[in-house]
């Protein structure tokens, strides 16, 4: 479709979308994935028979937030100047929070794509996300424990980190709800390097499962300490484990898992279809969860137009509210806050390399798993 309005009557069928992600700096690989995924979704929709055309403002380019709050506001203002009906982004909570505050003030629909901080959607009724929130991973870890039949678990968390606290609280609460005993709760700091004391106490408590919802840089140190203390059971973390360095600890990472937004190895047809098309066009380097979430976001806006009966912001907000959507990220139901209740991927490690293990739905039922 051309960028100028077509003949009378077609104007109503154009969904104008602004997109924001990190295009430069250390996180540029996310922006690359976002741009590719958005291009792919737009091309598919515009050559399809939905009757709608998606037009990406800013000349079709994803605006760069540079993973910086100030730069994010520049990116937001840049796409807003081009009159979008909705904005997609961003991937990091730190840059999405100020954009969400402004979007709520402007009455603009913002669909966040990776920002898991609880506060993002609290900014207003026009703010949604298609990723899970931090505490949700803790809940799903507890349901994993239940599905595997473990009855005694230990949790060690970084008390100085909001993310870690959020996952820990939800994990503990859902373990208690499901009759799973917490035999030991240990604290650490996000900068700690020695976990021998906590590991020894976890082992002494008789735990069969260790939950460590902390960031990737400390994960090898913690896993090493747990195994050295004689812990032979399952160890699990959240999406912040993604990219943890297992070098020299390959055997120690056996029977370790972490939750994530999606896995490119998931056997679900929607995932394999996306992975195949993306890889053919762009290769695998930028084929990450970010790409999958931005791809789904464009299709969610199409469904919002269909549900809401129009392509203006008010119609899209109406159509997005309470939406049920099936995409690369699985089955999604947007709750009263605009947060995604959705299936979650569990990855494990084989010879130190991340491998998909299984995907559970929001009730902890198995959706798909490795053969």
Where are these regions (language model features)?
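An alpha-beta-alpha
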Residues: 23, 127-190, 209, 301
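Beta-alpha junction/loop-to-helix N-cap segments that form part of ligand/metal-binding clefts
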Residues: 14, 29-34, 47-119, 130, ...
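Hydrophobic alpha-helical segments within soluble ligand-binding/sensing domains
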Residues: 72, 130-153, 165-167, 193-196, ...
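Short, low-complexity disordered leader/linker segments with a strong preference
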Residues: 1-16, 47-51, 363-371
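Extracellular/periplasmic periplasmic-binding protein-like sensory domains
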Residues: 223-295, 360
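Segments of small-molecule ligand-sensing domains
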Residues: 280-292, 302-356
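Periplasmic-binding protein-like
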Residues: 19, 79-91, 111-113, 154-157, ...
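Extracytoplasmic "Venus flytrap"
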Residues: 11, 18-37, 61-69, 92, ...
């Amino acid at each position: 479709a051309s960028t100028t309005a077509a003949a009378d009557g077609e104007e109503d069928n154009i969904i104008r979308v602004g997109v924001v992600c990190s295009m430069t700096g250390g996180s540029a690989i996310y922006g690359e994935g976002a741009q590719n995924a958005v291009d792919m979704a737009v091309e598919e929709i515009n050559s399809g028979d939905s009757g709608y055309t998606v037009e990406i403002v800013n000349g079709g380019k994803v605006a760069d937030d540079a993973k910086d709050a100030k730069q994010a506001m520049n990116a937001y203002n840049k796409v807003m100047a081009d009159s979008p009906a909705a904005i997609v982004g961003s991937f990091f909570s730190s840059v999405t929070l100020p954009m969400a505050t402004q979007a709520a003030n402007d009455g603009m629909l913002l669909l966040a794509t990776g920002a898991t901080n609880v506060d993002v959607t609290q900014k207003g009724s026009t703010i949604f996300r298609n990723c899970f929130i931090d505490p949700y991973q803790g809940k799903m870890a507890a349901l994993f424990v239940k599905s595997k039949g473990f009855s005694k678990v230990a949790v060690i968390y970084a008390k100085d980190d909001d993310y870690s606290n959020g996952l820990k609280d939800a994990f503990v609460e859902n373990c208690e709800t499901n009759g799973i005993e917490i035999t030991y709760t240990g604290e650490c700091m996000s900068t700690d390097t020695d976990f021998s004391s906590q590991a020894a106490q976890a082992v002494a408590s008789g735990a069969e499962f260790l939950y460590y919802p902390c960031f990737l840089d400390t994960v090898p140190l913690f896993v090493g300490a747990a195994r050295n203390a004689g812990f032979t059971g399952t160890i699990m973390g959240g999406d912040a484990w993604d990219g943890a360095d297992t070098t020299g600890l390959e055997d120690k990472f056996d029977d370790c898992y972490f939750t994530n937004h999606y896995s490119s190895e998931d056997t679900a047809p929607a995932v394999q279809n996306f992975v195949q098309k993306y890889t053919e066009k762009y290769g695998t380097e930028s084929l990450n969860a970010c790409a999958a979430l931005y791809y789904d976001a464009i299709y969610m806006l199409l469904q919002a137009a269909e549900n809401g009966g129009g392509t203006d912001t008010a119609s899209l907000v109406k159509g997005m509210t309470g939406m049920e959507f099936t995409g690369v990220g699985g089955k999604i139901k947007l709750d009263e806050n605009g947060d995604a209740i959705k299936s979650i991927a569990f990855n494990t490690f084989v010879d130190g390399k991340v491998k998909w293990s299984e995907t559970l739905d929001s009730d902890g039922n198995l959706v798909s798993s490795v053969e």
